[in-house]
UniProtKB/Swiss-Prot annotation:
Organism annotation: Human papillomavirus type 55
Family note: Belongs to the papillomaviridae E7 protein family.
GO biological process: DNA-templated transcription; symbiont-mediated perturbation of host cell cycle G1/S transition checkpoint; symbiont-mediated suppression of host innate immune response; symbiont-mediated suppression of host type I interferon-mediated signaling pathway
Quaternary organization: Homodimer. Homooligomer. Interacts with host RB1; this interaction induces dissociation of RB1-E2F1 complex thereby disrupting RB1 activity. Interacts with host EP300; this interaction represses EP300 transcriptional activity. Interacts with protein E2; this interaction inhibits E7 oncogenic activity. Interacts with host TMEM173/STING; this interaction impairs the ability of TMEM173/STING to sense cytosolic DNA and promote the production of type I interferon (IFN-alpha and IFN-beta).
Any single Pfam family the record assigns to this protein: E7
Region: E7 terminal domain, residue numbers: 1-41
Protein name per UniProt: Protein E7
Free-text note regarding domains: The E7 terminal domain is an intrinsically disordered domain, whose flexibility and conformational transitions confer target adaptability to the oncoprotein. It allows adaptation to a variety of protein targets and exposes the PEST degradation sequence that regulates its turnover in the cell.
A GO CC term assigned to this protein in UniProt: host cell cytoplasm
Nuclear export signal, short sequence motif: residues: 75-83
Length: 97
C-alpha cells in the first residue's frame, strides 16, 4: 500500500489455487502394539482377587460382611446389583425368609 487509504488498485489478489494436500495418513501402527494393549487390558480384567464387601441386611439392617473372589469387571457388576434390588440377608434373617 502506497497511500494513506487502501484502494482497489493497490489490493493484489493471487488467484492461483492452493496446492492440494493429501489428507490420507501414510503411517501405520504395528499390529503388535495393538495386541500388547489388548492383552494388557484382558490380563487386568481376567485376574481374580478377593474383595471384602460390607453391606446391610435387607431385613434388619445389621452389617453383613462378605468376601468374594472375582475379576474387576465382576465386582463392578456386583456393585451395580447391590445398588439395585439385590438384598443380602444376615444369618439371623435368612432362615425366616
Amino acid at each position: 500500500m502506497h497511500g494513506n487509504y487502501p484502494t482497489l488498485k493497490e489490493i493484489v489478489l493471487e488467484l492461483d489455487p492452493p496446492d492440494p494436500v493429501g489428507l490420507h495418513c501414510n503411517e501405520q501402527l504395528d499390529s503388535s502394539e495393538d495386541e500388547v494393549d489388548e492383552l494388557a487390558t484382558q490380563a487386568t480384567q481376567d485376574v481374580t482377587q478377593p474383595y471384602q464387601i460390607v453391606t446391610t441386611c435387607g431385613t434388619c439392617n445389621r452389617n453383613v460382611r462378605l468376601v468374594v473372589q472375582c475379576t474387576g469387571t465382576d465386582i463392578c457388576q456386583l456393585h451395580t446389583l447391590l445398588l439395585g434390588s439385590l438384598e443380602i440377608l444376615c444369618p439371623v434373617c435368612a432362615p425366616k425368609n
